[in-house]
């Protein structure tokens, strides 16, 4: 059991991502994140420098994307470990070059993970992200939008608006794009 949130939309970079950067971010999003013993990584993986970004393992090996063996986990380091959770489900779509959700279920701490990626990878590499990502969770009132402007992250929790259920209102809602709906909600003062 767990809680699932769905996402729609993406973040566009100020310049195209380098292929190596895409490969790294996508490998990072596929790995389980726990504190790792850097010295054991270096001893057990002769190619460890290829399995992190620019040869940097990061604090507690958090940037490492090589093979994940139980022996490299350092549970004693958990206090200083700063990854937001076990799974980061943001990735770079290789076809569009957009940062988006990878469709994995049960993505927790998604805003914190986005901030982690911006602070540790995108910003240091000179990438500025812009765009909107809408979210909707299993609970009726768990929805909103993440707006990113030049790597600054803003979130707007959604407001569930109930309409009388009739064909006219259904048609009006069906004609709104996500952007139009957001603009209309801002105009009406429902969100700011």
Which residues does each PLM region occupy?
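Charged interaction segments
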Residues: 35-37, 46-187
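Short, extreme N-terminal segment that most often corresponds to the first beta-strand
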Residues: 1-34, 191-192
């Amino acid at each position: 059991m767990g809680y699932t949130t769905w996402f729609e939309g993406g973040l566009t970079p100020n310049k195209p991502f380098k292929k190596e950067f895409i490969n790294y971010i996508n490998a990072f999003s596929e790995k389980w994140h726990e504190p790792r013993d850097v010295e054991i990584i270096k001893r057990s993986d002769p190619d460890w420098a290829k399995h992190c970004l620019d040869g940097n393992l990061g604090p507690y090996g958090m940037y490492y994307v090589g093979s994940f063996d139980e022996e490299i986990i350092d549970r004693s380091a958990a206090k200083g470990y700063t990854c937001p959770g076990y799974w980061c489900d943001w990735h770079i779509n290789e076809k569009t070059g957009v940062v988006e959700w990878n469709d994995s279920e049960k993505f927790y701490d998604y805003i914190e993970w986005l901030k982690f990626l911006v602070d540790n990878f995108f910003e240091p590499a000179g990438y500025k992200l812009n765009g909107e990502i809408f979210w909707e969770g299993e609970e009726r009132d768990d929805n909103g939008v993440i707006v990113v402007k030049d790597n600054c992250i803003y979130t707007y929790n959604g407001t569930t608006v109930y309409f009388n259920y009739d064909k006219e209102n259904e048609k009006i809602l069906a004609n709104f794009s996500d952007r139009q709906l957001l603009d209309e909600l801002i105009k009406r003062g429902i969100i700011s």
